[in-house]
């Protein structure tokens, strides 16, 4: 069964590209080569290249493993942690009861 290609709007593609650039900068600050990070993360160097370019087709697990190698795994927990919109919706429902 073929997987459906995900559509990413340009605005959000830019966010992925910025995240990839941040990961690349973190790697370079640690003076690690792409080969070193890829080996430690258990991925191909080409996958790391795609991560650093913000490719949306790379698995979330691969992103996590790269963050782990860079010591940034706690940043992964920040994704969707501050759900301000969800809290406002919840508050509105609670007030309405």
Residue spans for each PLM region:
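Short alpha-helical DNA-recognition segment
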Residues: 31-49
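A detector for short, charged/polar N-terminal pre-domain segments
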Residues: 1-18
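Short basic helix-loop element that most often maps to the first helix and adjoining turn
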Residues: 21-36, 97
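Short, charged recognition helix plus adjacent turn
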Residues: 77-97
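Short, basic-rich loop-to-helix N-cap that marks the start of a DNA-contacting helix
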Residues: 55-67
């Amino acid at each position: 069964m073929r997987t459906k290609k995900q559509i990413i709007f340009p605005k959000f593609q830019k966010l992925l590209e910025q995240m990839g650039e941040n990961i690349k900068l973190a790697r370079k600050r640690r003076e690690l080569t792409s080969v070193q990070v890829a080996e430690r993360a258990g991925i191909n160097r080409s996958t790391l290249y795609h991560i650093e370019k913000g490719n949306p087709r790379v698995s979330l697990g691969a992103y996590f493993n790269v963050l782990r190698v860079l010591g940034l795994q706690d940043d992964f927990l920040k994704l969707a942690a501050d759900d301000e919109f969800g809290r406002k919706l919840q508050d509105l429902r609670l007030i309405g009861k």
